[in-house]
Each structure stands twice: as structure tokens, then as C-alpha cells.
């Protein structure tokens, strides 16, 4: 008996080291080894001393007003709060799954008192029997001989790690969204002020044309042309008044609270609002993009689930064991000779399951293939977002300079047309065309500047930036990794 028990224990220890989880191999990145090159992309310096993902958002965003708004959003945004709670929930799920590897030991106390009728009693007379017991032990503890429970534990661990990356992704998205909403608000405020100024100019021209018309110098056509310019500017003014209000509402939603009243003075759109970040190499994205890391953890979780599905084909052994004391009298539980013990192993060997085990294994493998495709798609999406950002960086500088030159030329055109109209050399149609050309060019300059800024924000996010508040240097990273530093 002792030899059989010892053999069983040795076999359990040996088999407990078995794992049926397939060896994990990271899929090859389905993108080029370098970002696109060409006229649109400018010069890419390659590997960066400090990766963009390690540059703190307080260093990237130079506007103190925007910095404070991002801080408010990180404290109050509900989506970010849900992401953090999801991490806690999956951490608890992992702890639950890990606990199944160990026996659950508890104390059981029981007591029964039963009356048997005479026809069931061995003596032929009614009898009352009593039994009391206290035991310490475990019930139905599964010996993880083929790694099923360890596979489920590893799967839960990878899912927990995936939610951590999802939280990180939610934060980087929130930081970029707050910045975009803030920049959009500033741009629409600039458009609103430009429209007010333009409306004032149109109104002065209309008043001048009205006086000229009253004395018979200007025609009715000139007067109506001036009026159309005024009414068009009024409509545009109402549009930007609405957009500014909606931009503020969108910002409040992202902040999770009202816009603070004591914000510091912000920077203007024409000032240096952002720090240029290095692009690095595509291989950096595999370790820096939280959505890619999340997809990889989900892939590793699916890989672990294959091990659990394989282990289901093998026997499962459960153990119930306890030791304690039993007695007919409650007062005799701890008397000499009242000791008791139970050792009850059980084995379950699947023989016929109507194909369910094979189907479960096929399902686990298909899920892994799905996760491989999702992981590769995440890499491709990241590569495209970075490439688009680099193309925007390489062309917006030239576009903005050309647009500024257009505004300058349009302003000179307007000044000349206004002078010629006032001296009677040219008609009002030329002046109206000059006014509209200048207004359109100024509007487009604001729009182009907003697009340039948002493209830089999106590039920062695409490179994994927005998680750290302060820049993390390589020395700081090394200290974190070295416990003796």
C-alpha cells in the first residue's frame, strides 16, 4: 500500500512538469524593415536616442494650458476609469485560475442524529444513532498531470497582461484626443475671430457703397454685391459660433469634468506648440505600441488555450483526502482512538465524447489563427499610421509656407483693389473678389495649421507616445530593469 502510494506521488511529480502548450513563436512582421522614403517623407534619421514612446507628454505638448487639461482628463475620464477597472477584474480572474493549481484545504464539522424504525434496525427495535466529526482536508483537488490547469492559468495571465496594454492604449488615445479637441477649439476660435474681423470689413464696405449709392455714384448692382458679402460673413459667423460651443462640449466630455476656470495662459496657433519626435524604426513599434502588445498577449493567450484543449484528451485525476476525529458522542470527539482519515483518489478517462474534444481543439487552433491575423493587422495599421504621419510632416511645412505667401499676396491684392475702387479706377466687383480671396486664404491657413498640428499629435500617438508624463531616458530604464541599481 505504501509502495503504491509512493509510486503514485512520484508519477504525479514527474507528470506535473509536462506541458502541452505549443512553443510560442512571434509571427514575422508583415511590413518593410524601414519606413517609406521619397519626396513626401523628408529625412528619417533612423534609430532614435530616446524613442517617441518614452518622451513624456509634458515635454511633447508645450502649451501649459493643454498640459493642465490633459492632467484633468487623466484623473476624471470615464473611459480610462473603465479600462483601469478592467485590469483589476482580469487580475482577479488570473488569481482565481492560478488558485486552482493548489488544493483548497478547509475544516469541516458535521453532526447527524437519526432514528431508525424497528423494521430497519438490526435489533428489530427502534433505535437512535448519533455521529459527530471534525476533519481537515481537501475535496476533489485535480492533480494537474498534463498541464490543463497551468495552460488555463497562462491563458488568464496573458489576458490580464493584454488588459494592461489596453489600459495603456486607452490613455494614449485619450491624451491624443484631448490635444486634438483643444487644438480644434483654438482653431475654431481663431476662425471665429477672423470672421468677426472680416464681417466688420465687409460692413464698412457696404456702408460706403450705400452712401455712394444714395448720391448716385454707386450702382444698385454694387450695393447688392456688398450686401451678399455681409450676409455670407454673417452666416459663417453663426457657423463658427456653433462650432466653438460644440468643441467646448467635446472637450468637457473628454475631461470628465468642466473646464477649469484657473487655466494658465495658452499659446497661439502660430507658436511652437509641439516638440518634434523621432520616428525610429518599424521594429520599435513591436515593443512600443500598446495595441500591438495587446494583440500579442491575446495571441499568447490563444496559444495557451491549445494546451488546455490538448490536455482534455488525457485522464484527469482528482483527490479527496482528510484527517480528523469522529465519535458517537459530541463530547468524545477528541478522546483517544477517535481519529479518522480518508484518502479517495478518482480518475476520469474520456472514451467517447461524440467529437467534442476534437472540436474544442480545432476551435482553439482557429482562435489562434484569428489572433495571428489580428496581430499582423495591428502591425500593418501602426506602420500605415506612422508612414502617414511622416508624409504629413514632410509636406506640411512647405504647404504652410505657400499658404502664408498666398495670404500675403491676397492681402496686397485687396489693398490695391480697395485703393482703386475708392479712387474710382476700378469697379466694386474687383474689390469684392479681393476681399473674398483674402478671407478664403486666411481661413485655409488656419485649417492647414490645425491639420499640421493634429498630424503631429497622431504621429506621437502612432509611435506609442502619451503613456509617460515625463521623458524616460535609457539610464532610467536601465535602473528600473536592474534591481541592484
From Swiss-Prot:
A lipid is attached at residue 18 (N-palmitoyl cysteine). The keyword Lipoprotein applies. Pfam families: OEP. GO terms for cellular component: cell outer membrane; efflux pump complex; membrane. The keyword Transmembrane applies. Disruption phenotype: Disruption of MexA, MexB and OprM significantly reduces active efflux of N-(3-oxododecanoyl) homoserine lactone/3-oxo-C12-HSL/PAI-1, but not N-butyryl homoserine lactone/C4-HSL/PAI-2. Residues 1-17 form the signal peptide. Induction: By growth under severe iron limitation. Changing residue 216 to A: Abolishes complex formation. It is a lipid-anchor. PROSITE patterns: PROKAR_LIPOPROTEIN. GO terms for biological process: response to antibiotic; transmembrane transport; xenobiotic detoxification by transmembrane export across the cell outer membrane. It is found in: Cell outer membrane. Its main location: membrane. GO terms for molecular function: efflux transmembrane transporter activity; transmembrane transporter activity. A lipid is attached at residue 18 (S-diacylglycerol cysteine). Export of antibiotics and solvents is dramatically decreased in the presence of the protonophore carbonyl cyanide m-chlorophenylhydrazone (CCCP), therefore may be driven by a proton gradient. Antibiotic efflux is inhibited by pyridopyrimidine derivatives, such as ABI-PP, acting by binding to a hydrophobic pocket in MexB. Keywords: Antibiotic resistance, Cell outer membrane, Lipoprotein, Membrane, Palmitate, Signal, Transmembrane, Transmembrane beta strand, Transport. SUPFAM superfamilies: Outer membrane efflux proteins (OEP). The outer membrane component of the MexAB-OprM efflux system that confers multidrug resistance. Functions as the major efflux pump for n-hexane and p-xylene efflux. Has been shown in one study to be involved in the active efflux of the autoinducer N-(3-oxododecanoyl) homoserine lactone, thereby playing an indirect role in quorum-sensing; but has been shown in another study not to be involved in efflux of this autoinducer. Over-expression of the pump increases antibiotic and solvent efflux capacities. Belongs to the outer membrane factor (OMF) (TC 1.B.17) family. Component of the MexAB-OprM multidrug efflux complex, composed of six MexA subunits forming a hexameric tube, binding to a MexB trimer, which interact with the trimeric OprM outer membrane channel protein. The OprM homotrimer forms a 135 Angstroms-long pore. It consists of a beta-barrel, which is probably inserted in the outer membrane, and an alpha-barrel formed by alpha-helices which probably spans the periplasm. In the ground state the periplasmic end is closed, while the outer membrane end opening is 6-8 Angstroms in diameter. This is Outer membrane protein OprM.
